[in-house]
Amino acid sequence: IDLDVVCELNGKRPDWTQKDIKELVGDQLRNHKKYESILDDEGRRCWTLKYRENGNPNERYHMDILPAVNTTGYSIILEKAYSNLKDQSYEDLVLSITDNERIPEYSTSTEPEEWLQSNPFGYAKWFMNIADNIKGQRTKMFSLNESVNPTPKYQSERLPLQRAVQLLKRHRDIMFQDYSEDDKKQKPISCIITTLAAKAYDGEDNIYDALLNIIHKMEDYIEEKYDFSLMKSVKWISNPTNEAENFADRWAIE
């Protein structure tokens, strides 16, 4: 299990850089008695809390906390995020995030508009718009709120695409559970699995057919593009809410 949480700041001091904000969030977690012992080393963009690391491998889970700055206004973000699910306008949901590999701006830039942009709310809206589009079914079963709530109540009823993604992630976790820490870095990240599954999904009304179709077609959505900065062709999986962002950027490095 993994939980993705956005630590959203609705403003900042004018002199704060990405580094300042990232460290501020990290310090708050580090200074909390409950989180100090389970806080992992600083990640590229997130802080991670690891739960039950010494317990049963099947019961371990982690929470990724993404520091972000909202330059639009909190009320506007909420209004846009929870508006009509079929509205495919995502640009107003963009947040500015930290990235400690973007040198030197990570420790120098104080303008959030210049930082790396991310769109977790827009991505959730994109995903649910696809998941809710089941062949032969006109009634909307789920709301966007159920897809972005960080800790929703357990729901036994899920859409076929949601269940298929859960199974694919579980398969990944089991496959890599006995690998070394270095080899575990080769695991496909969750947003890659989710994106490829959603793009391959064709409105199947049951988990079996959905999973079969996704497994058969998901590879077709891995593109190849020429990266001028690396002077070579790289695998490319576009963020559907930001086509310039490559979810598979690590593949080119590794």
What are these regions, as identified by a protein language model?
Residues 19-80, 91-118:
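Conserved catalytic core of two-metal-ion nucleotidyltransferases
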Residues 146-254:
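Conserved nucleotidyltransferase catalytic core and NTase-mimicking acidic/glycine-rich helix/loop elements
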Residues 9-13, 53-55, 69-75, 174, ...:
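Short loop/turn segments at secondary-structure transitions that flank enzyme active sites
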Residues 22-27, 82-85, 214-218:
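Amphipathic alpha-helical scaffolding segments
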Residues 4, 48-50, 129-133:
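Flexible, surface-exposed loop/gating regions in the mature catalytic domains
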